[in-house]
Structures are given as structure tokens and as C-alpha cells.
């Protein structure tokens, strides 16, 4: 989860430290709103040619942003241990050929979480005020506008959710 929290912090421009706006727990709660659980989800192979034979050592998912605790299984549901993994990009590699790889774990939408956090942050800074004194001006309202503008940009990048609707009044 720490990689996803760091990624979300990077997206919203809130580095961890003494001056951070959000705690890791607040970011994790926002990520949990945009979480999907997968059980035995089939991965796709990337072929590798070894001595003129095709082997499947590298596997990937079309879904991105997996939590690092994702578990991998072979076609008979035996546990697998990858030689390398990149769960943020949904990629796992093995030292030996695998015929099928399934993954169980959670994916997140850091862009959706970033939008929520940016909108909360904009709500916080909306309470700040602009000051004009002796011809000099300090404008804090531009911070709110910038946060909302970034939120609107990320809203376009977040995961699309669709639902099937059935009408009971139409036969």
C-alpha cells in the first residue's frame, strides 16, 4: 500500500513530512473508496523465445495499480512466487515457464482518490482569504482554483465505472 500512497501523494503534490496536508491513513481511506477485489483473475502472457521455443515467463494484467500483496497461482491453484514483480503496472516475471497464471488481490484508482483529496484540500483552503494592504496584495484564492483545476484534470483520467440498468416498467 505504501507505493500507492506515495503515488497518490505525488499526484496531489503533498510530499510526506512535517508539512504534509494529509496523513497516510487519510490517503489510504481515499484509495479504499476506489478499490476493486479480484479473485483468480487470469493474467496474459508475454512470449519469450528460448532456444527457438516459446516460453511464458512474463505475465501482465490489463488492470493497473495492484496492491503489493497480490497472490499468484498456477492453473491448478498452486501458489507461485515471481522472480520479479511490478504490481503498480500489473506485471510479474518468473524464472521458469508457466502455462497459466492467476492473480488474487486488490486494484486501486489513484486518480479517483487524488480527485477526492484535492477537492478536500480545496475546501480547506477556501477558508483562507485574500489581503490587500498599502497597494500590496496577497491572493490565496488562486490556490483553491489551482487545486480544483488539477482535480478536474485527474477526473478525466480516473477509472471509468459502468453499470447495467434494467427497467421494470418496460416489457
Each model region followed by its residue ranges:
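Long, highly charged low-complexity segments enriched in Glu/Asp and Lys/Arg with interspersed Ser/Thr
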Residues: 141-162
Amino acid at each position: 500500500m505504501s507505493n500507492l500512497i506515495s503515488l497518490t501523494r505525488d499526484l496531489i503534490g503533498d510530499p510526506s513530512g512535517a508539512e504534509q496536508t494529509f496523513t497516510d491513513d487519510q490517503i489510504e481511506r481515499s484509495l479504499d473508496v476506489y478499490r476493486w477485489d479480484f479473485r483468480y483473475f487470469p493474467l496474459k502472457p508475454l512470449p519469450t523465445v528460448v532456444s527457438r521455443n516459446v516460453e511464458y515467463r512474463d505475465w501482465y494484467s490489463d488492470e493497473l495499480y495492484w496492491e503489493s500483496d497480490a497472490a499468484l497461482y498456477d492453473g491448478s491453484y498452486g501458489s507461485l512466487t515471481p522472480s520479479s514483480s511490478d504490481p503498480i503496472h500489473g506485471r510479474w516475471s518468473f524464472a521458469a515457464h508457466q502455462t497459466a497464471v492467476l492473480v488474487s488481490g486488490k486494484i486501486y484508482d489513484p486518480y479517483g482518490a487524488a480527485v477526492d483529496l484535492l477537492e478536500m484540500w480545496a475546501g480547506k483552503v477556501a477558508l483562507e482569504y485574500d489581503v490587500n494592504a498599502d497597494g500590496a496584495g496577497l491572493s490565496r484564492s488562486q490556490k483553491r482554483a489551482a487545486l480544483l483545476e488539477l482535480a478536474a484534470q485527474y477526473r478525466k483520467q480516473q477509472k471509468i465505472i459502468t453499470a447495467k440498468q434494467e427497467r421494470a416498467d418496460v416489457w
